[in-house]
Amino acid sequence: MKIPIYMDYHATTPVDPRVLEAMLPYFTTEYGNAASKSHAFGWKAEEAVEAAREEVAKLIGASAKEIVWTSGATESDNLAVKGAAHFYQAKGKHLVTCKTEHKAVLDSMHALERQGFEVTFLEPERDGRLDPAKVKAALRPDTILVSVMHANNETGVVHPIAEIGRIAREAGVVFHCDAVQSIGKIPFDVEAMNVDLASISAHKMYGPKGMGALYVRRKPRVRLVAEMDGGGHERGFRSGTLNVPGIVGMGKAAELARLERDAEAVRVTALRERLRKGLEKELDLLTVNGSLEHRVPGNLNVSFAYVEGEALMMAVKDVAVSSGSACTSASLEPSYVLRAMGVSEDLAHSSIRFGLGRFSTEEEVDYAIRLFGEKVRKLREMSPLYEMVKDGVDLNQIEWANPH
């Protein structure tokens, strides 16, 4: 077992060796530009790009013509949300999303608000899931877009996307789904789930970073205003010379995900449960954040009461985990996802996200259980609040002196 141990698979995944192997020739001998139509170098590159497009489409039940290459899921989210809003704004300027979306969606929505669009931000239930009835109630005649993620990046909670998609479809509203954290882990099918636009990332499924895709439905056709102007690549949706090695890597990652997903889901769920039960055996006052029933296999988001998340992370340097999402973990604000779910500020501050994946082992899980057990106990020994609770004091009944 190698130290440090990686348990942050929601932030990124290692590139699978089989993916790297598929990519390497496109850095060396096969260096053509896929847009070069007049010679064999370009034809070979284009052939590789189209084969990868087929693989990504197959993984989500789409047709290859519906896959647009991007630089990653942040770009895909921006292109979907802003592109659809700008195209359909003559019909209305109302958008609907959830408070626990990824920042790429939330900040795109805020940017649109500054341009005169109106956005309804829905609250999830206590278990982190969004009730489809709330989406239905939020729709208005001028609603043009609903954007709800499939699986949350912090809690791993899976939303009832098929039902939300059906509600949007019946209302004639475009439905975008950020499927970054679910694709390759659990089934995601654009037809069964009534999805019009879907964001996909390569580096969340053992492919390279800086590579993504956007699914854009053709029947009924969904239209977007391009965010990037240029040579008209990707049917005008996304200009710019294609990243052939990255695309080949994403295609291979999609193929492996399709072939290995179901067996891997069983294995990783077993590891997650081993971790959860082990931590619960070691420690008291442990809270799992979000639904355990509706959750991606490798996610465990836990609050260790009376322990500061940042202090705990420093104490467990040998295990790579995160408190909050990697995109926002530079700020010490409590997780906005957990706060939107109604988790108290103290518990949100003490939350740790474990992410298990393809290369995680039982040995690593057992090591993490022992390490977290030891370090949490040590930090709690320094907490007078923990001592008071153990002595039966109800902290809610105490009137604290106001220092200000």
From Swiss-Prot:
This is Cysteine desulfurase IscS. GO terms for biological process: [2Fe-2S] cluster assembly. Pathway: Cofactor biosynthesis; iron-sulfur cluster biosynthesis. Master enzyme that delivers sulfur to a number of partners involved in Fe-S cluster assembly, tRNA modification or cofactor biosynthesis. Catalyzes the removal of elemental sulfur atoms from cysteine to produce alanine. Functions as a sulfur delivery protein for Fe-S cluster synthesis onto IscU, an Fe-S scaffold assembly protein, as well as other S acceptor proteins. GO terms for molecular function: 2 iron, 2 sulfur cluster binding; cysteine desulfurase activity; metal ion binding; pyridoxal phosphate binding. The active site is at C327 (cysteine persulfide intermediate). It is found in: Cytoplasm. The gene is iscS. Gene3D superfamilies: Aspartate Aminotransferase, domain 1 (3.90.1150.10), Type I PLP-dependent aspartate aminotransferase-like (Major domain) (3.40.640.10). Its EC number is 2.8.1.7. [2Fe-2S] cluster binds at C327. Pyridoxal 5'-phosphate binds at A73, T74, N153, Q181, S201, A202, H203, T241. The keyword Cytoplasm applies. Homodimer. Forms a heterotetramer with IscU, interacts with other sulfur acceptors. Its cofactor is pyridoxal 5'-phosphate. The modification N6-(pyridoxal phosphate)lysine is found at K204. Keywords: 2Fe-2S, Cytoplasm, Iron, Iron-sulfur, Metal-binding, Pyridoxal phosphate, Transferase. SUPFAM superfamilies: PLP-dependent transferases. PANTHER family: CYSTEINE DESULFURASE (PTHR11601:SF34), CYSTEINE DESULFURYLASE FAMILY MEMBER (PTHR11601). It catalyses: (sulfur carrier)-H + L-cysteine = (sulfur carrier)-SH + L-alanine. It is an enzyme of class 2 (transferase). GO terms for cellular component: L-cysteine desulfurase complex.
